[in-house]
A protein has these predicted regions:
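Post-cleavage N-terminal segment of exported redox proteins
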Residues: 1-31, 106-112
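Processing junctions and N-termini across compartments
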Residues: 24, 37-40
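Residue-level detector of flexible, active-site-proximal loop/helix-junction positions
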Residues: 25, 67, 94
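Short, conserved catalytic or interaction motifs in soluble domains
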Residues: 26, 48, 92
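Gly/Gly-Pro-rich "capping" loops immediately C-terminal to redox-active cysteine motifs
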Residues: 32, 36, 48-78
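The canonical Cys-X-X-Cys-His
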Residues: 39-49, 103, 107
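Axial heme c-ligation environment in periplasmic c-type cytochrome domains
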Residues: 54-64, 79-112
């Protein structure tokens, strides 16, 4: 009898967990993060205020970006996917294309 109660409890707990995961997972997609929020999550530790803790010659300012051949959203995403020495790689599994685009657009529009 006690075993049956435990089994029911585990089944109920699992069902509630699945429901909560799908319910809240769906709401997260309905309210996507902004480029600024994505930047803060993935980039700001090394690129605080558009700087560069690892390589100060490669900040996110327009002047430094252009000096280093980074002129477009596509160029920024290319670096995210295959970065140089000292930068973490953000593949599509880690950072989906839509989020990478938001970050790149945020960089271009924010760091002049």
């Amino acid at each position: 009898m006690k075993t049956m109660v435990k089994v029911r409890t585990y089944i109920l707990a699992g069902a509630i967990g699945i429901f909560a995961f799908t319910a809240f997972g769906g709401s997260a997609r309905a309210n996507p993060k902004t480029g600024e929020a994505e930047f803060k999550e993935y980039c700001s530790a090394c690129h605080f205020d558009g700087g560069n803790l690892i390589n100060p010659a490669k900040t996110l300012s327009k002047i430094d970006r252009e000096k280093n051949g980074v002129k477009s959203v596509k160029d920024i995403i290319k670096i995210m996917r295959k970065p140089g020495e000292g930068m973490s790689m953000f593949d599509e599994k880690t950072l989906p294309e839509t989020d990478a685009n938001k970050i790149a657009e945020y960089i271009i529009n924010t760091f002049k």
